[in-house]
Every structure is written in C-alpha cells, then in structure tokens.
UniProtKB/Swiss-Prot annotation:
GO terms for biological process: cristae formation. It is a single-pass membrane protein. It comes from Mus musculus (Mouse). Belongs to the MICOS complex subunit Mic10 family. Component of the MICOS complex, a large protein complex of the mitochondrial inner membrane that plays crucial roles in the maintenance of crista junctions, inner membrane architecture, and formation of contact sites to the outer membrane. It comes from the Eukaryota. Component of the mitochondrial contact site and cristae organizing system (MICOS) complex, composed of at least MICOS10/MIC10, CHCHD3/MIC19, CHCHD6/MIC25, APOOL/MIC27, IMMT/MIC60, APOO/MIC23/MIC26 and MICOS13/MIC13. This complex was also known under the names MINOS or MitOS complex. The MICOS complex associates with mitochondrial outer membrane proteins SAMM50, MTX1 and MTX2 (together described as components of the mitochondrial outer membrane sorting assembly machinery (SAM) complex) and DNAJC11, mitochondrial inner membrane protein TMEM11 and with HSPA9. This is MICOS complex subunit Mic10.
Length: 76
C-alpha cells in the first residue's frame, strides 16, 4: 500500500469518525431532551454507538488493502 493510499484511508477514516460521532451525539441530545428527562446517558450511548460504528468502518478499510472507495486497485 502506497503512502498516498494510506493517507486517503486515514482522511476518510477521520472524516467518517467525525460525522458518526457528531450524529450519535446529536441523536443523544434529541432523545435526552424529548424522552429521558434530560439525563446524560443517551448522549454517552449515542456517542459510543457512533464511535463504535466509525471504528468498525476504519478497521474494515485498513484490513482490505486492495479496496479504496469501493474500487479495486490493481497490483503493479
């Protein structure tokens, strides 16, 4: 795997982590305010789920060395 491919995978991983963590946190806020009387655990749960999903996606991306954004990279 070349350095540029590795950099692209790290960039995609970090962007995915920010999006999923923010979405989980946002959903935690919504559920905390509407259903759970302003408790803190929905925020932690939503953030944890988002972080776990992002970690799983990153792990999958790094374990598949010949896939990059859904395209096969040919060996040279």
């Amino acid at each position: 795997m070349s350095e540029s491919e590795l950099g692209r995978k790290w960039d995609r991983c970090m962007a995915d982590t920010v999006v999923k963590l923010g979405t989980g946190f946002g959903l935690g806020i919504v559920f905390s305010l509407t259903f759970f009387k302003r408790r803190m655990w929905p925020l932690a749960f939503g953030s944890g789920v988002g972080l776990g999903m992002a970690y799983s996606n990153c792990q999958h991306d790094f374990q598949a060395p010949y896939l990059l954004h859904g395209k096969y990279v040919k060996e040279q």
